[in-house]
Amino acid sequence: MVKLTKRIGGLVLRLAAFGAALAALIVMITSRERASFLAISLEAKYTDMAAFKYFVIANAVVSVYSFLVLFLPKESLLWKFVVVLDLVMTMLLTSSLSAALAVAQVGKKGNANAGWLPICGQVPKFCDQITGALIAGFVALVLYVLLLLYSLHAVVDPFLLQKS
């Protein structure tokens, strides 16, 4: 019964992480807004910034990985390798989220020293979508940290319980 509960707990955690990464991916991909003032037209989209593209690619990789691991049989010998891949996915999410957060902060506040003006006043819907994608990405990251701890416990625990 305990093993079944652990298996279901891990499955629910993986499913939630998959959902959060997929949500971050979809919200970021659909972020686009066009604004016009005077004779100038401005279109903001995620492809304008390399950090946002990296965020999309990272969340796509994590989503595909999360989906595939959901179908891995519990008897598979690959579960020890899954722990390593969980760590890689956690690091990938961390780096992409931090890069996207830095760019989003500049978009929101600007940078007076560099002469960069904030754009969120002109394209608020775009900025709101970026914020939503970053929140979903942060949820995915937290879930992946928990998943990594869970995976480590599941793989290491049998070794600790063995009698010498």
Swiss-Prot record:
Give the Extracellular membrane side ranges: 29-51, 102-129
Name the organs or tissues of expression.
Expressed in the stele of the root.
Q: Where in the cell is it found?
A: Cell membrane
What UniProt keywords apply to this chain's record, in alphabetical order? Answer: Cell membrane, Membrane, Transmembrane, Transmembrane helix
- Where is the chain membrane-spanning? 8-28, 52-72, 81-101, 130-150
Q: Which GO terms describe its cellular component?
A: plasma membrane
Claim: Membrane is one of the keywords in the record: yes
Which loops or segments lie on the Cytoplasmic side of the membrane, by the record? 1-7, 73-80, 151-164
Taxonomic superkingdom: Eukaryota
**Which membrane topology term applies here?**
Multi-pass membrane protein
What family classification does the UniProt entry report for this protein? Belongs to the Casparian strip membrane proteins (CASP) family.
The record's subunit annotation is:
Homodimer and heterodimers.
Q: Which PANTHER family match?
A: CASP-LIKE PROTEIN 1U1
- Protein name according to UniProt: CASP-like protein 1C1
Question: Which lineage is the organism of this entry classified under, starting from the top rank?
Answer: Eukaryota, Viridiplantae, Streptophyta, Embryophyta, Tracheophyta
